[in-house]
């Protein structure tokens, strides 16, 4: 089974996703695919909170800022996978190096293909994404490209 959770920032999506991934696992291995590459103290604090939330839930954390399928090559496909988050994964693919100032034109396609391949390879997966489309603000070209790319990936 594949489950997609989308919503506003910091509203409990990850906690819900953890509960669902545990239920889906039915005693099988649980994997938490952590996609955030921390850039500052706020990111590190969020990572600490998420780790504390998972404490006792028996998730094996797989750090996969990019190339998810390569990162899980030794994982059990019958296990339960929680990918948190599609939003961070897309950012990592669009800007693959810390100094990248222009988005990689193939980043969104690569991200989408990785996620579709993950769906094909594993039995159960829960995907977390941020809903960033409802504020009605017109953004610069880079941000609009990111928003369009995330919407395209979320629909997959």
Show where each model-derived region lies.
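Helix-adjacent hinge/juxtasegments
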Residues: 57-107
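Short amphipathic alpha-helices and their capping/turn segments at secondary-structure boundaries
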Residues: 20-21, 64-79, 111-123
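Conserved P-loop
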Residues: 2-74
